[in-house]
Structure formats: structure tokens, C-alpha cells
A protein has these predicted regions:
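Conserved alpha-helical "signature site"
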Residues: 1-164, 168, 172-253, 293-294
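Terminal helices and disordered tails flanking the catalytic cores of nucleotide-processing hydrolases
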Residues: 1-10, 253-300
């Protein structure tokens, strides 16, 4: 296909055979939405996939969920975390597995998922401190927020590279999503939400994926989208080892107002994110996770 013919819909349709969400995740998502399905039946469905079960239990027992080895079975995970949280973790884990075999020339899967995991952890910490909103799967929303980038990297690598280089070298630092719009007419958020819709992901995840760069555009879940928007900046700071907010992407004033978190609290969340990051990526992907040590806390 000629590059000028790409649209978010054709990109997702073109890659669908390569990144179809595994049947186990689709079945579990359907069962969670079915009022006649029991927690026990959902647990049995998960247990049919031994690799998924093992990874789910490792993640559920991680510091990110505060269980400290207390969850020994899938049924216990459902009881403690709830069926929707377990469903969303299942989607996140299987999505990582799905994309692991997808080639691209612009970024390694390890670096992509490392940044995504940092965003997921930051989102959880922000959700625990913010005022308002529902605790709608902040971890998984953070994990999947940039999934549209992987579609672009794989299906339209030349256009994605052009946008990436523009974002790096532009004097006014416009941000990758704006450069994607200039090059392609759309950004990775809309590509990601088209994939999320194909997968039947919950509406809250769709909004977080689509609007995480522009939280003021969120319709149904503005607090949750603002959380992922802010977590994106916290993840960058955790990655580079800084608590100075000037070192990361600017946080929307709307998000700061909506979440009611000051700069000192955000600096603490950067530290929390770093502390909880080590060991999380291996749980999800098997790859090691290393983040730089932070210098002295520097708060605006």
C-alpha cells in the first residue's frame, strides 16, 4: 500500500492478523461482561493457559498491587483484585506476548515496554493519591497507552521514522503526536484506539489510549485520562533519573487541576515509580528492568 493511503483503520486492518488478541483474553473479557459468568468460571478459563496463569500470579504479587506473595491462586487473585482488574491484567499480559514477535526497526520491544511499565506504575501511584475518578485499571491503561506506536512502527515505519526525527530535532519541541499529525494526518492515539476497539477493550482504556496527550478532549473518563497523561511525564522522569518536572513533557494545566497534585507530590511519585519498577518488567516480559538512580530531589 502506498504510504499516502494509510488511515488509522487501514493500518489496524492490515496488522490485525499479526496482532489479534489471543482467544483466552477475548473469552475472559466476554465472560466478565456476562452477568451469568461466575468468578470461578473465569478463573478456570485463565488456568487453561499455564503461561498466562504463572505471569498473572507473579504480577498480582508484585509491589505494584501490594500483595507481597499473598496470592497463590487465580481464584484468590480474582477475590482480592476483582474480576475487572484481573481481566485487564490478562489483556495487558497477552498484549505484550502478542507484540513480542512483531518486527520493527525503530525501537526495541524491551525499551518500549520498559517505558510503558514505568507509565503503568506511575499511573497506579497517581490514582492512589488523586482526588476523584474511579479506580479503573490505571496500571493496564498505562501499560497500553502507546500501543498505537507499535502499529505505526510495524506497518508505516518510514512515516513513523519521519515523525520521530521531526520530534527530536524540531526547535520548538512539538511532541511526537503533533509531528505524527503533520506527517500522516493522525497520531498514534487514534491508531491505538482503533486497535483497542477491534479488541473490544473497555471504554476507559480506549479513552486513555486515544487522549493521553490531550486529556481535555476526554469525554467519559477525564480523570482517568488525566492520570495517564500525568503518568506519561512521570515515566519519562523516572527513566532519566530526575524529579525536576522541567525535564519531562509538560503536564496539561487541566490535568494538574483535575488531579489536584502539586509538584512536591509528583516528585514523590517519581521516586515511588522508580522504587517499584525494578523487577516488574521481568514479571511481564522476562526482560530485565533497570532504571537510573535518582539524584537529589529537585522540585519546582
Amino acid at each position: 500500500m502506498n504510504t499516502v493511503d494509510w488511515t488509522p483503520e487501514t493500518l489496524v486492518a492490515d496488522i490485525e492478523d499479526l496482532v489479534t488478541l489471543p482467544e483466552v483474553a477475548l473469552r475472559i473479557a466476554s465472560m466478565v461482561d456476562d452477568p451469568t459468568s461466575s468468578a470461578a468460571a473465569i478463573g478456570r478459563e485463565i488456568c487453561n493457559d499455564a503461561a498466562l496463569t504463572a505471569r498473572l500470579l507473579r504480577v498480582a504479587n508484585s509491589p505494584a498491587f501490594g500483595q507481597d506473595g499473598k496470592i497463590a491462586t487465580v481464584s484468590r487473585a480474582i477475590t482480592v483484585l476483582g474480576v475487572r482488574q484481573v481481566r485487564d491484567l490478562t489483556v495487558g499480559i497477552t498484549a505484550i506476548r502478542t507484540f513480542d514477535g512483531i518486527a520493527n526497526e525503530l525501537v526495541t520491544m524491551e525499551s518500549f515496554w520498559r517505558q510503558s511499565v514505568l507509565c503503568a506504575l506511575a499511573a497506579g501511584h497517581i490514582a492512589a493519591r488523586r482526588q476523584g475518578g474511579r479506580n479503573e485499571s490505571p496500571f493496564v491503561a498505562g501499560l497500553l497507552h502507546d500501543i498505537g506506536q507499535l502499529v505505526l512502527f510495524n506497518r508505516a515505519p518510514e512515516l513513523a521514522r519521519q515523525a520521530l526525527l521531526m520530534s527530536i530535532y524540531a526547535a520548538d519541541e512539538p511532541g511526537l503526536y503533533r509531528c505524527e499529525r503533520e506527517v500522516m494526518g493522525f497520531d498514534h492515539g487514534i491508531v491505538g484506539v482503533r486497535l483497542a476497539q477491534k479488541w473490544g477493550l473497555p471504554r476507559v482504556l480506549q479513552e486513555c489510549i486515544q487522549f493521553h496527550h490531550e486529556p481535555s478532549e476526554a469525554k467519559e473518563y477525564p480523570i482517568e485520562v488525566a492520570t495517564i497523561h500525568m503518568a506519561d511525564t512521570v515515566a519519562v522522569l523516572a527513566e532519566i533519573g530526575s524529579t525536576d518536572l522541567r525535564d519531562g513533557p509538560a503536564i496539561s494545566p487541566m490535568a494538574l487541576r483535575a488531579l489536584k497534585l502539586d509538584h512536591a507530590t509528583l516528585a514523590e511519585i517519581v521516586l515511588q515509580t522508580q522504587e517499584s519498577a525494578e523487577g516488574m518488567l521481568p514479571l511481564l516480559t522476562g526482560a530485565p528492568m533497570a532504571v537510573p538512580a535518582l539524584a537529589a530531589v529537585q522540585v519546582l
